[in-house]
């Protein structure tokens, strides 16, 4: 018992990753499919998690629970498959995920969750998604900070061009950046980073909707896009970019990034990790 207590106390210090025996690195050849899995929605305001598909997001034909290890179960994760299509080192620009006609009630569901500061959590290759920020409080010493997940949306304000005060805006376009590492000691590439940069775009197009072949007029332009307001029922087009970046970080060190997560998230992340360490003693 004394040993367990000492380990627990040591583990509640800000830490991020944990390693479960039997979890081995996966090597992906160029062009091979990489699964992007959706997880829960969480908020530090409510502490009440929701399943990802509790909101009217794009869904695959068959939604399946795909939790892979005990750690995910202990964290209360609700991991499911997704409709996103990614291939190792194959980049995408403004790829259409789906188009949905949302009712006033569905728009309000999104808006309420945004008001409650809900964040979306995804998983790729057993890594949770993260959003990167640069803290420039001290201009001469900028600090990179990561937050787990990414914001579902934001509330409009006078400081945000093209928005109305108090109206909710949905982050329907996502830049997915995956960092990979290669080495002579193995074939293919290993995933060592998974970042999301969300944005809100009211997409437009000419002519009839042609599913994935539709040419969106709101992609690739130099002019600022209009954010997608949730103030009335209507069309929502979900899109995403995929970017691949080589990294010197090795697979065994890929969790080090999560040492830079924000203070509020460090607290809960550390407690859960500590409990798992004690259980595995």
What are these regions (language model features)?
Residues 6-271:
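Soluble extramembrane domains flanking the early transmembrane region of eukaryotic membrane proteins
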């Amino acid at each position: 018992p004394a040993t367990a207590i000492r380990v627990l106390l040591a583990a509640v210090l800000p830490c991020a990753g944990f390693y479960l025996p039997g979890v081995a690195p996966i090597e992906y050849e160029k062009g091979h499919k990489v699964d992007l899995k959706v997880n829960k929605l969480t908020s530090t305001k409510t502490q009440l998690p929701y399943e990802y598909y509790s909101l009217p997001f794009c869904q695959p034909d068959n939604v399946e629970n795909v939790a892979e290890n005990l750690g995910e179960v202990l964290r209360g994760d609700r991991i499911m498959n997704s409709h996103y299509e990614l291939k190792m080192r194959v980049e995408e620009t403004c790829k259409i995920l789906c188009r949905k006609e949302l009712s006033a009630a569905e728009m309000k569901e999104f808006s309420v969750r945004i008001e409650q500061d809900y964040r979306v959590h995804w998983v790729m290759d057993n890594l949770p998604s993260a959003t990167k920020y640069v803290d420039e409080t001290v201009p001469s010493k900028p600090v990179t900070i990561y937050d787990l997940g990414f914001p579902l949306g934001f509330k409009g304000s006078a400081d945000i061009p093209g928005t109305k005060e108090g109206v909710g805006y949905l982050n329907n376009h996502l830049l997915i950046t995956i960092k990979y590492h290669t080495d002579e000691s193995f074939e293919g590439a290993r995933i060592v980073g998974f970042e999301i940069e969300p944005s809100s775009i009211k997409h437009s197009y000419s002519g009839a909707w042609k599913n994935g072949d539709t040419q969106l007029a709101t992609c690739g332009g130099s002019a600022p896009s209009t954010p997608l307001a949730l103030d009335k029922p209507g069309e929502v087009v979900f899109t995403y970019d995929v970017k691949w970046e080589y990294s010197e970080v090795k697979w065994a060190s890929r969790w080090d990034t999560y040492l830079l997560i924000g203070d509020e998230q460090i607290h809960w992340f550390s407690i859960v990790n500590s409990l798992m360490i004690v259980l595995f003693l």
